[in-house]
Amino acid sequence: MISYTYITALSILVLNVLNVACTSVDDWPNLSPQIEIALRSQRDIGKYISIDQVTGMGVSLNTLVFDKDGYTLDALNDVSTLLDVGVQTLMINLYWNEFTQKWQLCPAPFPANISSDITTSKELYWDGRTYKCEASLTVDSLVRTINTYLAETNTNIKVNMVHLLFHLKSIRIDPPSGNVSSSEIKDYISTFQPTDSHFVALNNATLNDTVSSFGTSLFTPSDLSSYRKSNYRKGDKVGFYNETRKSFPNLNTFLLLDYKRVMTTVIANDLVKSQYTYNVTSSDKKSVFLEGSGVDTTVASLSDPDAVSQCNELIHYNQDNIEVFDNISLKEHFRIVVDDNGTSFTNVTFSDFVRCGFSPILNASYYNVYNDEEGVSEIDGSLSDIVDNFIPLSFWSWAENQLIEPNRGLNISDSTDTDNDEERDDNDNDDPLVRRDMDYKSSHTAFKCVVLDENGWKVSDCYSRQPIACQKSGSPNDWHIDVKTKREYFTAYKDDSCPDDYNFGIPSSSIEMLALMSYIERENISYPVWIDMNDITVPDCFVTGGPYATCPYQMTVTRLKLAGLIAPSFIVAVVILALILCEKIFRTNPIQSNRKRHWKKAINKYVEKYDYEGVPS
């Protein structure tokens, strides 16, 4: 018989297995921070948009990090923080050191007499400026920092694309002017060629080597060429973005099917031509997107009046011609705009370029940011203050300060149909105080659906009656809204809500959003308007597909997962049962053995005493 102790142990084991299974269903990550929810929802809505149309805020590491903190390993902590808070584009100056014939991050060459302690920062004077540089800060160390971030976010919930923009520059050999001999030039060059073995082992001699540590997560020109030649792109969901030969994989293919995370692009090449300059190798062309490698990056400058005026014209475009938006979506790729100390972004210009489909790159040392405590705007050079100011403005989708509890968007329903019968009748209460109380009571459960207003997406009461944004199939920049048809969100997805060939839709990119807002302005339609998005099933998990769409991140236990959960515990249980069985078979109990010998002896004595032969008479 199995002892009570063993039964108890097995019971606890079974309960633990069941507890693990149940916990896996309910324990999905708590993604309550506003920015994280906005980042994930915008990414999910745009996952079938080609990667060249994905936009996001960027930062110049040289201007805002290294020039202020020094070119040291400690500065990489800021890089990690930038990635963590949602900055997905990093602009970096790569310097070709003509003295050492290697790429480095420090803008100045290290002297030949540098100490063997490569982790000590040095004050280096070069080209009229003094830099604080640490030899151990290499491109490899930067890549390792980014790889750490990639590993930490390698889940379906957090995965995203990181774009590195390289500006190539030269640390040129410029010997003293005048009549100098070749030996004097050689001596001059040697003064900036450290011979210490620790230093010589640092940095890389080719662009390919600088990015090779990304491994298979790097999306390369070779990958793009293979994608365009294969039939793979035919399987991408949004055919509109695959109409040209210069098509790119969509974000879903990039991240979740091909498992790519990083793309490196040279956006400017200021290498000085000389006998010591860098020559691009065939390996470079296969790993880094250079000019002519199939990516025509659009780089605009904020100081360029034409770029500003073109963006303003696009925002206020009121002509019935969707080709303007289609041409941008199909013919312009990776659109970025960079500012400088002469013309830095304001909140308005930053937001405008985001709306125009650009990725704004912060490249100025100081910005006019809003101080919440003082309630005023002030010039600030703090990286954290600058990023905190611009991150909420970096979404082409969500309006600023959305997703903040408890209000969750519009405070008062725009509907006057208070009895929710989809008709305006005598049963509806026009008293604003009564309506306010009714809206307040339902706000905690009904504010789960998304509308579009003049500032972007906002969470609203699902029972409010609004016009419906209808998007044409196969033509995502073509919209239709019938102002006479106002419905609750729960009925907006029905077939009769939109004309033939149109469906209840949502903008999946900044240009689609701009096309919709242009249509609304042109048709003089009042905001807000329903778009197909809600978090009804799981809080903070915004999905498209109507009110019954399920959250893709809600944990479920399939048979395979359940088998995986139970298998380890089942093996342990089998081992325990085997041990119990072995104990029953092979273990000898002294008390039980003595008892058997006693009775056997007594029986033998009885038999000897009363032993009979034959049948007693």
From Swiss-Prot:
It comes from the Eukaryota. Residues 416-431 have a biased composition (Acidic residues). One of its GO terms (cellular component) is membrane. InterPro entries: Telomere_Capping_Maintenance (IPR051008). Residues 23-561 are extracellular. Residues 1-22 form the signal peptide. Residues 409-435 are annotated as: Disordered. Keywords: Glycoprotein, Membrane, Signal, Transmembrane, Transmembrane helix. The chain crosses the membrane at residues 562-582. Pfam families: TIM-barrel_MTC6. Residues 583-617 are cytoplasmic. Belongs to the MTC6 family. This is Maintenance of telomere capping protein 6. It comes from Debaryomyces hansenii (strain ATCC 36239 / CBS 767 / BCRC 21394 / JCM 1990 / NBRC 0083 / IGC 2968).
